[in-house]
Amino acid sequence: MEMTNAQRLILSNQYFLMSQLDPNNANKYKRLQTIVERGYELHMRELNREFGCLPETECREIIDIMEMYHAMQESNRMLDDAARKDVDQRRLTFLGFDMATEAQLVNYVRFLVDSEGLYPQFDKGEHHFNSQMPMLAKYRRMLTTWRNCPRQYHLSGNELRQIMNA
């Protein structure tokens, strides 16, 4: 991360203020302040993680994935009891993404749900949409199958199973 001395001074002051305002995370902010003040370039890369960029195409893909889960849940509600018994209800829960490898995606989902108020019916679970295992490849396969369904918001039990097993 390239920064002028003036930018480093401003960021250092921000970290100092944050350490005063948030005593629970004071050590974290003091550490970051030291890194910025002293210009430790190896460690300044950590700052890039906090200022990520999620392109519009990826944002739309995440929304499509969440919309697919919404459609699956609503379709499941419309099934009769006999058809619903053949659908694994646990697999209708949107788990989110892996914080270790898909952190930007987890944070975007949290933003959509918490800040934008979208998909309030999704259960955040204990891990707040951290699936604790990579999910993007699985969701992409599911999206392909879902998009091939003729009635995406009125899925049959068989279509639900095909999507989940993609």
UniProtKB/Swiss-Prot annotation:
It holds the Pfam family YfbU. InterPro entries: UPF0304_YfbU (IPR005587), YfbU_alpha-helical_sf (IPR023146), YfbU_helix-hairpin_sf (IPR023145). Belongs to the UPF0304 family. This is UPF0304 protein VC_1871. It comes from Vibrio cholerae serotype O1 (strain ATCC 39315 / El Tor Inaba N16961).
